[in-house]
Amino acid sequence: MDEFHRCGKEDSFWQQCFLYPLFFQEDLYAISHDHYLDVSSSSRPMEHLSSNDQLSFLTVKRLIGQIRQQNHSIVLFVNCDPNPLADRKKSFYSESVLEALTLVLEVPFSIWSKSSVEGMNECKSFRSIHSIFPFLEDKFPHSNSILDARIPYSIHPEILVRTFRRWIRDAPSLHPLRSVLYDYRNSPENLQRSIIVVPRVNTRFFLFLLNYYVCECESILFSRLKRSSHSRSLTHGSFPQRTHFHRKIKHIIIFSRRNSLKTIWSLKDPKIHYVRYGERPIIAIKGAHLLVKKCRYYLLIFRQFYFHLWSEPYRVCSHQLSKNCSSSPGYFLRVRMNPIFVRTKMLDELFIADLITNEMDPIVPIVPIIGLLATEKFCDISGRPISKLSWTSLTDDDILDRFDQIWRNLFHYYSGSFDRDGLYRIKYILSLSCAKTLACKHKSTIRVVRKELGPELFKKSFSKEREFDSLPFSSKAAARSQRERIWHSDIPQINPLANSWQKIQDLKIENLFDQ
């Protein structure tokens, strides 16, 4: 596969026209077979791995020949499984062939994505100690409205196959993809017409399908937004499984005065900003309310025209950007804008300019966070910690790891806030709730748990030194972070609190449109 990648980089003819012969490569199915056994062996005991888990390459060739018939009324791979009554998702042949199909389709997509990233000089992503707050500081104060557009995952199989034809000219290589998509649509779990892209199905094929679908939506949308925007540039960024960060981009215009030899620099703010975290795209717009309505209408028409699907109106909702609060990556942030008065004086005393700018001071929203903790049964509505009864069946290490993960995510997100008193109040609630959960599990008291498990138990998970262990700072930087506002975001996945908050917001939006 690596050799084919190198050949594809040298000659685009290979990457677009000769994918179908790869389906008859025995090495390809050997790779997918080994990968399937590795995944299945990690999820089930060794005694469940039968001797029937062996791939017959002759059967695979016959399967590919039958795919050319395109009989979508027959469920694919059922006749090949040693146990026809087994679930199709757990079928050995379906998983192996699906893995091979994903490997073949990833070849042109990976080559195209690498070439597009290498050629994109306007905006490059990189890891930083700063979180999404630079985006909020630089972009949101210059915008007055935001569009929260959830990506629709309901799409017809044929439309999805036709989008692949834009990048893959080898038509026979798309026959297996078409058969798999129709097979999934006709399965007993999905007796609907167009439910295909499922973001929560943790398989390689559907993750690749989701990434391609989102990339296709954004690539077309960016080109249209750049044409419709009055600004020459459109800043955008994506925050998938891990949080990636983008450099602060400032568009500078240079002009000079005839009567002065000095050069004056002024900033030109783009009018449309796009950021996506997972499946939640956010578009920040600067303009009148009519422009916001046009953008919302354009997004709905765009999805209907290019993907032939109807999006519910609540999936693209517009909000007036508040000056004291904002929400991003599933978290809630309260902001205090402090005006700063700056006076500038030129050396030759030609003129004196007074500038008034706003400084964004984030504040920990203690009341909404306590409300979320109460919803997840970590405390009551007044903020008094209680035991998490649903976690008492777990081991002590699992309980500590879950509480520690929630605390570290919240600390990394809100550590740059102006006032940390509310943040350490959240730490007190989580640590005491963890102690009560362990005491409830062992049917004892908090004092007995501390005495039996040791005083170092909670210091390991909730210690103040642990907060800076994962920060890429030196000891001086760690000490300086005590008094300076430094953000560090290392959130591989959204914790249950953020998911709970997002569900509450979705219900509010749906109820608003139902009325």
From Swiss-Prot:
Which keywords fit this entry according to its UniProt record? Chloroplast, mRNA processing, Plastid, RNA-binding, tRNA processing
Q: Does the keyword Membrane apply?
A: no
The lineage's top-level taxon is Eukaryota
- The secretion signal range is none
The GO biological-process annotations, alphabetized, read as:
mRNA processing; RNA splicing; tRNA processing
Per the record, its GO cellular-component terms are: chloroplast
Where in or outside the cell is it found? Plastid, Chloroplast
- What is the first-listed, main subcellular location in coarse terms? plastid
TM region positions: none
Q: Which GO terms describe its molecular function?
A: RNA binding
What family name appears in the similarity comment? Belongs to the intron maturase 2 family. MatK subfamily.
Summary of the function given for this chain in its UniProt record = Usually encoded in the trnK tRNA gene intron. Probably assists in splicing its own and other chloroplast group II introns.
Spell out the PANTHER family in the cross-references.
MATURASE K (PTHR34811:SF1)
Q: What is this protein called?
A: Maturase K
